[in-house]
Amino acid sequence: MLTSPTYDGLVSDVKSIAEVVHRRNIPLIVDEAHGAHFGFHKAFPENAVAYADAVIMSVHKTLPAFTQTAVLCLCSDRIDEKEVEKYLGIYETSSPSYVLMAGIERSLRMVSDGGSELFAAYVEKLSCFRASVRDLKHLAVPDAEDFSGEEAYAFDPGKILIVTKNGMSGQQLQEILLRDYALQMEMTSGNYVVAMTSFMDTEEGFGRLSHALHAMDARMEDTGKAAFSPKDIYRQPEKQMEPYQAEEAAHGSVRLEEAAGQVSADYIYLYPPGIPMIVPGEILTEPMIQIVRQCQEAGLDVEGLPETDIINIVKNARIDYN
């Protein structure tokens, strides 16, 4: 199973990955929650349905549909349709919302009937916005060419990443945009925010965002400091035991400053996007604890801790990692 695109709009090489797994007759499932708009215009990446065996798309994320609406696309005979129907019967509600289902149909009909015109206008608005913010000095709005091949195979231009270059945290940037300019961002991270767009956004909306960024940029100064980046946040801790073993073991709680060498009993993550920084069974190191602290101090939403300075650990599993 593969997530593509990411919350930030980074897209994997689904075609090549599919070729590898299909040579071993393994089905490929793609979580394309943020890519329901792919494939309607050449400016956007290809839709994963061309290569994967099953694709899940959250229609409500990038198309005009009600929250909670999504579709499951079965794309090859490697996935047993009857088996899928069996489990849908087990897990789906027996009282589905016809309002939500009608919303999906209306959204798909909209892009089916007028998608070419809608997406052409959308791409033009995105291009004009990106051109308007290239002169920013203390903020940056990356384009596809700003990502190396190692970071992403492709990039969704509909995701607007606004990166700080003067030490301001993503949380501070989001708060200013909301408080002073009534602009709500989708997500914050260490040194950037993500603005979600769709073909329903207007020229006026893109203009307001461009104006806000220029106004903020003009007031910023070069502090010589840098906010910690996502590369600092997501490291690969050492695993002491499997997650299920850690979850089934006896647990205790310790203060964060006393947790170095302990084995985590919980998932610790920022939400959004929900990618774990620490997984049950992994060894808590001093650098990892400092990253959790940095995230808290930056105002990011750290989930999984029972209290701000408390973490659940596996009893009698302490490791001397020095």
Show where each model-derived region lies:
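Non-catalytic surface loops within mature trypsin-like serine protease
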Residues: 76, 166, 199, 315-317
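Charge-dense polyanion-binding interfaces
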Residues: 301-321
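Conserved PLP-enzyme active-site core in the AAT-like
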Residues: 1-145, 164
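Conserved C-terminal alpha-helix-loop-beta "cap" of PLP-dependent enzymes
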Residues: 128-304
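Generic secondary-structure boundary signal with a strong preference for alpha-helix termini
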Residues: 21, 43, 119, 194, ...
